[in-house]
Amino acid sequence: MFNRIFLFLLTNVAVLMLAGVVMSVLGVNPAQMSGLLVMAAIFGFGGSFISLLLSKFMAKRSTGAQVITEPRTPTERWLLETVRRQAQAAGIGMPEVAVYDGPEINAFATGANRNNALVAVSTGLLQHMDQDEAEAVLGHEIAHVANGDMVTMALLQGVLNTFVIVLARVVGGIIDSAVSGNRDSGRGFAYYIIVFVLEMVFGMFATMIAMWFSRRREFRADAGGAQLAGRSKMIAALERLSLNHGQNTLPSQVQAFGISGGVGDGLRRLFLSHPPLTERIAALRAANGTAM
């Protein structure tokens, strides 16, 4: 985890330093630029890491997920035993296991630490999937935890947030100066309007980048689920999802880590956290045994 954080921070600092050089060439005040970079990094990463640290608490509260401490039914006992076995195979600590009330077939994983995560399944999943299919879904979620996807997404979002804040203000300043014709006249009301609009535009592109990365993660988590539960079980689980694909009612903060995402075509597809189920199934069918 810490190696990943260090690498992302190092990359972010290097690119921001390059941006600082470019902005200096464009005539942006270096002192103002340094302050802007620091402010952007604090706000950009701060929000992402606060969300990450609170992710388990917020997920439980928003979904009403009930953590299984002492199994009361054979199903709950099976859930705990399956997650424990898969967590050991993946080399991570035993996550909390929870069930939340939801009609859709879905599950999610969250948590700031791969050794202190949460895996939750919907009541709809338990009602409509057999144990082989449910085992594959649990393997998919354990793979998310083992791959450190929650931390990686938080780091990526922090980098993107930082760049949105910086670029919106730098480009806004350049446009404002060009329109007013006076760099020293101070920022007018128009500058803040321009920055607001640019943050919306750049934020949209940042979301597209984050969702592209999220879709890549899903293929990897499917492969991990296939390794833990078996490729045929993982394919069967995704086929079941394709037959019973309903509205995703998961809260936005955990949707990216569910087994199933939304559907859409054209431009809307660029903002989806999950690839189409047909593509995920095809990728599993095309994978050879050693890749799984």
Swiss-Prot record:
Family in the record: Belongs to the peptidase M48B family.
Binding-site list for Zn(2+): 140, 144, 218
One GO cellular component term noted in the UniProt record for this chain: plasma membrane
Active site: 141
Source organism, top-level taxon: Bacteria
Enzyme nomenclature, EC number: 3.4.24.-
UniProt entry tagged with the keyword Metal-binding: yes
Intrachain disulfide bonds: none
Biological process per Gene Ontology, one example term: proteolysis
UniProt-annotated location(s): Cell inner membrane
Cofactor(s) demanded: Zn(2+)
Alphabetized PANTHER family for the sequence: PROTEASE HTPX (PTHR43221:SF1)
Organism: Xanthomonas oryzae pv. oryzae (strain KACC10331 / KXO85)
UniProt topology in membrane: Multi-pass membrane protein
Gene3D superfamilies per UniProt: Metalloproteases ('zincins'), catalytic domain
HAMAP family the record matches: Pept_M48_protease_HtpX (MF_00188)
Main location: membrane
Official protein name in the record: Protease HtpX
A Pfam family the protein falls into: Peptidase_M48
Enzyme category, top tier: hydrolase
CDD domains, A to Z: M48B_HtpX_like
Keyword field contains Protease: yes
Membrane-spanning segments: 5-25, 34-54, 155-175, 193-213
Cofactor binding: number and manner: Binds 1 zinc ion per subunit.
Key words of the record: Cell inner membrane, Cell membrane, Hydrolase, Membrane, Metal-binding, Metalloprotease, Protease, Stress response, Transmembrane, Transmembrane helix, Zinc
GO-annotated molecular function: metalloendopeptidase activity; zinc ion binding
